[in-house]
Amino acid sequence: MGFERTSSSLSLLSSSLPSSLQPSENTRAKFSLFYLLLLFFVLCVIATFTITPTSTSSPYNRNSNSGTLGNFYAKEEGKSTVVIKKTRKIGDRSKEAELRRILRGLGSSPPRCSSKCGRCTPCKPVHVPVPPGTPVTAEYYPEAWRCKCGNKLYMP
């Protein structure tokens, strides 16, 4: 009654299998299916690593041939602290462009508003809160850049 197999249960098992697949052939078929699935999985993993974009096309990787030290300014409660971090120089940027990037600080850069306000002058970029389309009272609205001349705001 336990978990022992008797010869009658084996004969019953072999009689229920098709005549083309005996117990040893059935096991062999399962193993070959397992190896085919394993091979398919390995090929998928290899294809994933070979098809992914190179490091030069990623906007987050800053790889180059010449390495330089860069200064990064982190704002902390109204104070500006200098953090020295190893970075690599991208392409042939000039020192002024590198300095502008460092001094600009965190966040998005302001747009060029020279021709966005029409004939109105001076046209300056400003940060403005943008409420959502539906009327919702919130403590925080996301901010966006707009060009401002006088009391009017223009899309950059």
Swiss-Prot record:
What taxonomic lineage is listed for the species of origin?
Answer: Eukaryota, Viridiplantae, Streptophyta, Embryophyta, Tracheophyta
Main localisation, per the record? secreted
Q: What does this protein do?
A: Acts primarily as positive regulator of inflorescence growth. Endodermal expression is sufficient for proper inflorescence architecture. Redundantly involved with EPFL4 in procambial development regulation. Also acts as tissue-specific regulator of epidermal pattern. Controls stomatal patterning by repressing stomatal production. TMM (AC Q9SSD1) functions to dampen or block CHAL signaling. Not processed by SDD1 (AC O64495). Acts as growth-regulatory ligand for ERECTA family receptors.
Task: State the Gene Ontology BP annotations.
Answer: guard cell differentiation; stomatal complex development
Expression (tissue specificity) = Expressed in the internal layers of the root, hypocotyl and stems, and in the midrib of developing rosette leaves. Detected in a ring of cells surrounding the vascular elements. Expressed in developing stems soon after bolting, in inflorescence stems, near the root apex and in the chalazal region of ovules. Not found in cotyledons or in stomatal precursors or stomata.
Q: What compartments host this protein? A: Secreted
One Pfam family this sequence matches = EPF
Cellular component, GO annotation: extracellular region
InterPro entries to which the protein is assigned, alphabetical: EPFL
Give the family, as the similarity comment puts it: Belongs to the plant cysteine rich small secretory peptide family. Epidermal patterning factor subfamily.
Q: Which UniProt keywords apply?
A: Developmental protein, Disulfide bond, Secreted, Signal
Domain of life, per UniProt, equals: Eukaryota
Q: What happens when the gene is disrupted?
A: No visible phenotype in wild-type background, but restores stomata to hypocotyls in a tmm background. Chal and cll2 double mutants are defective in growth, with a short stature, shortened pedicells and compact inflorescence.
Assembly and partners? Interacts with ERECTA.
Q: What is this protein called?
A: EPIDERMAL PATTERNING FACTOR-like protein 6
Q: Which cysteines are joined by disulfide bonds?
A: C113-C147, C117-C123, C120-C149
Write down the species: Arabidopsis thaliana (Mouse-ear cress)
Q: What residue stretch is flagged as signal peptide?
A: 1-47
Q: Which gene is annotated as encoding this protein in its UniProt record?
A: EPFL6
